[in-house]
Amino acid sequence: MRLKRNMSDNSQKKVIVGMSGGVDSSVSAYLLLQQGYQVEGLFMKNWEEDDNEEYCSAAEDLADAQAVCDKLGIHLHTINFAAEYWDNVFEYFLAEYKAGRTPNPDILCNKEIKFKAFLEFADEVLEADYIAMGHYTRRSFPTAEGEKPKMLRGVDSNKDQSYFLYTLSHEQIARSLFPVGELEKPEVRRIAEEQDLITAKKKDSTGICFIGERKFTEFLGKYLPAQPGKIETADEGKVIGEHQGLMYHTLGQRKGLHIGGQKGGNGLEDAWYVVDKDLKRNVLIVGQGKDHPRLKSNGLVASQLDWVDRQPIRETMTCTVKTRYRQEDIPCTIIPIDDENIKVIFDEPQIAVTPGQSAVFYSNEICLGGGIIEQRI
């Protein structure tokens, strides 16, 4: 009994596990079986690859998911959500890049696909009581009448994925289980090896799911025409290079600028960082040193808000925020502008706060929700 759950009443509960072909979902299915649930797997295909493309991991992932389900003795269903993904995730992704922002499609995939389309299919077609995913996050299990389940950080602080799940409501959390959120990653791999699961040593997937191991610039260039332009220094406005497209760059970026070795106006040879984008002139603005003043922000404005309890914030409140994944918590104050927009003031200035990314708020272990960063302050 690896997880802290009462197993006495689980045998009548059906759980559909999102089987990705990775180690986390594999161990999630195993743990749920150990807890006595009726477990079935569901493999999602969210992206249609060209047959000509070298990158084609979906077939491999499906084979691994099937092998794990066979080993565990559970049925694996498959579903194609490629159309939903294109309409609700990928088109937004392209629109944001076209607007010079840096979106996070994984958050939108969780919102529109894994905890909406997947949940609806599991509910209506497979008659599930719960769905389960291999995310490193936890949820509370209410004990008092009227109490609602909360989204909590995962036990493994290095792998905690609550940042990607801030859009979930109490109702979605109530229908979801996160077995590996109670464990640290090495323990998950150990269980997979112990159970002789084919995914035990499989490398974690990295990057954006539909791009995989391909070069980001090549992939994006297929869908959005690149517009080369000048690279200017923030301090003197001096042209020191050319970029291949603003969409390929993000605030705080140091690598891939191809302007190394050039001294700034102060004669220093410090590394150059992207500190801003001038969309009107199609100019990439760079400064020297990661502490360049143009990289720093005292706060942000966020919109497209998703609070876990679905109630807008009406009064000023203090909490902590992350403006990117795996960032240390930043103490801050939230000031409501209206129901759709908030101003956030950091206790200390922060670097590389990036429009298009998500600001996610916490009260200790509890994820409160978040929104999309519209602008830096």
Swiss-Prot record:
Residue pairs linked by disulfide bridges in the UniProt entry: C109-C209
Ranges for region Interaction with tRNA: 159-161, 324-325
UniProt-annotated stretches for the region Interaction with target base in tRNA: 104-106
Gene Ontology cellular component terms for the protein in this record: cytoplasm
BP-aspect Gene Ontology terms: tRNA wobble position uridine thiolation
Reaction equations catalysed: S-sulfanyl-L-cysteinyl-[protein] + uridine(34) in tRNA + AH2 + ATP = 2-thiouridine(34) in tRNA + L-cysteinyl-[protein] + A + AMP + diphosphate + H(+)
Subcellular location: Cytoplasm
Active site: C109, C209
InterPro entries: MnmA-like, MnmA-like_C, MnmA-like_central, MnmA-like_central_sf, Rossmann-like_a/b/a_fold
Keywords: ATP-binding, Cytoplasm, Disulfide bond, Nucleotide-binding, RNA-binding, Transferase, tRNA processing, tRNA-binding
Enzyme Commission number(s) from the entry: 2.8.1.13
Class of this enzyme: transferase
Binding site for ATP: G18, M19, S20, G21, G22, V23, D24, S25, M44, G134
Residues with site note (Interaction with tRNA): H135, Q357
Molecular function terms, GO-annotated: ATP binding; tRNA binding; tRNA-uridine 2-sulfurtransferase activity
Function: Catalyzes the 2-thiolation of uridine at the wobble position (U34) of tRNA, leading to the formation of s(2)U34.
Entry-linked NCBIfam families: PRK00143.1, trmU
Family: Belongs to the MnmA/TRMU family.
Name of the protein this chain belongs to: tRNA-specific 2-thiouridylase MnmA
Gene (UniProt): mnmA
